[in-house]
Amino acid sequence: MGRAFEYRRAAKEKRWDKMSKVFPKLAKAITLAAKDGGSEPDTNAKLRTAILNAKAQNMPKDNIDAAIKRASSKEGNLSEITYEGKANFGVLIIMECMTDNPTRTIANLKSYFNKTQGASIVPNGSLEFMFNRKSVFECSKSEVKNLKLSLEDLEFALIDYGLEELEEVGDRIIIRGDYNSFKLLNEGFESLKLPILKAGLQRIATTPIELNDEQMELTEKLLDRIEDDDDVVALYTNIE
C-alpha cells in the first residue's frame, strides 16, 4: 500500500479501540510464535519480534505472558492461513489470518466479499506472484543518533545483514530487505544494539494502482470489514 493510503488507514486506526481490536491480533501472533519455536524469547526470534511489536502498541506484560502460556493449551491450536481476493477497479487483496477455525474464517471473509458488488475470493496462488515479500524493520532516528551513527553509517552496517533499502519517514527509519533476510537483519540490529520499534514480513505490490477518492471510499468499506475480523492479522493490497 502506498503512503497516502497508509496515512488514511493510520488515521482510522487511531480511532479503533486497541484493547478490543489490536491486542487480540497481537496475542495470536505471540501464541503462534511460542507454539512454533518455544516459549523462550532468547532462543525464538519469531517470538522476540511478536513481543516487540506488542510492546510497541503498549500491550500489558500480563497479556503478553498469557499469550505465551496459551501456546501450550488447547486455546493455542492456531494455524496460519492466507486468502486472496479481488475487488472493483483492479484492486487485489491478500489476507493473512491466524485462526483456530478455518471454516469460520473463510465463511466470514466470503460474506464480506459477497456484500461488495464485483468482489470475490479467488483461489490461493492466483495473486501471490503480483506481490514481493519483504522483511521490514522500523527504528527511531533518535536511537540511531544516540549510537552516534549517521544514516550512511547505518546503511553500511546493515548491508552485510541483507539491507536492500533505507528510507526516512518522519521520526522513523524504515529498513527493507529480502523476505529470507528477516533473521539476518534482526541479528544486525542486535549487533548494533539498536532498538527495533516494529518488525515483520510484508507483501509489496509489484504494480501498484491509484484510486480516486470515490473509488477509495467504496473500496475502504470492504477493507474495513476485513480488517475488523479478529482472525485477520495482516491485509495487503496493490493500492498506491
From Swiss-Prot:
Entries under InterPro entries matching the protein: Integrase-like_N (IPR017856), TACO1_YebC-like_2nd/3rd_dom (IPR048300), TACO1_YebC_N (IPR049083), Transcrip_reg_TACO1-like (IPR002876), Transcrip_reg_TACO1-like_dom3 (IPR026564), YebC-like (IPR029072)
GO BP terms: regulation of DNA-templated transcription
Protein's UniProt keywords contain Thylakoid: no
One Pfam family, short name: Transcrip_reg
PANTHER family, A to Z: TRANSCRIPTIONAL REGULATORY PROTEIN YEBC-RELATED (PTHR12532:SF6), TRANSLATIONAL ACTIVATOR OF CYTOCHROME C OXIDASE 1 (PTHR12532)
First-listed, main subcellular location of the protein, grouped into a coarse class: cytoplasm
Species per Swiss-Prot/TrEMBL record: Helicobacter pylori (strain P12)
Location(s) in or outside the cell: Cytoplasm
Source organism, top-level taxon: Bacteria
UniProt keyword annotations, A-Z: Cytoplasm, DNA-binding, Transcription, Transcription regulation
GO terms for cellular component: cytosol
Name of this chain's protein: Probable transcriptional regulatory protein HPP12_0160
One Gene Ontology term of the molecular function aspect: DNA binding
Family as reported in the entry's similarity comment: Belongs to the TACO1 family.
